[in-house]
From Swiss-Prot:
Residues 61-80 are mitochondrial intermembrane. It comes from Mus musculus. Component of the cytochrome c oxidase (complex IV, CIV), a multisubunit enzyme composed of 14 subunits. The complex is composed of a catalytic core of 3 subunits MT-CO1, MT-CO2 and MT-CO3, encoded in the mitochondrial DNA, and 11 supernumerary subunits COX4I, COX5A, COX5B, COX6A, COX6B, COX6C, COX7A, COX7B, COX7C, COX8 and NDUFA4, which are encoded in the nuclear genome. GO terms for biological process: central nervous system development; mitochondrial electron transport, cytochrome c to oxygen. Its main location: mitochondrion. This is Cytochrome c oxidase subunit 7B, mitochondrial. Belongs to the cytochrome c oxidase VIIb family. InterPro entries: Cyt_c_oxidase_suVIIB (IPR008433), Cyt_c_oxidase_suVIIB_dom_sf (IPR023272). It holds the Pfam family COX7B. Keywords: Membrane, Mitochondrion, Mitochondrion inner membrane, Transit peptide, Transmembrane, Transmembrane helix.
Length: 80
């Protein structure tokens, strides 16, 4: 492409982008779903996960395979 044509096209693109940005900045934007409810949904999900894991860890009797160090004593060797 000729340098003159390149320059003209790049200016057209920049100008159209600037016009779009100017139009968007003058309009009042209504809050989206995420703006309205995002933090409440995030907090609710976090509370649900923490409460579910707390119940699971404390109430349903899972054997967690804790370390036997200090609870298991070795048997004496038998001489044969």
């Amino acid at each position: 492409m000729l340098p003159l044509a390149k320059n003209a096209l790049s200016r057209l693109q920049v100008r159209s982008i600037q016009q779009v940005v100017a139009r968007q900045s003058h309009q009042k934007r209504a809050p989206s779903f995420h703006d309205k409810y995002g933090n409440a949904i995030l907090a609710g999900g976090a509370i649900f996960c923490v409460s579910t894991w707390t119940y699971t860890a404390t109430q349903i009797g899972i054997e967690w395979n804790m370390s036997p160090v200090g609870r298991v004593t070795p048997k004496e060797w038998r001489d044969q």
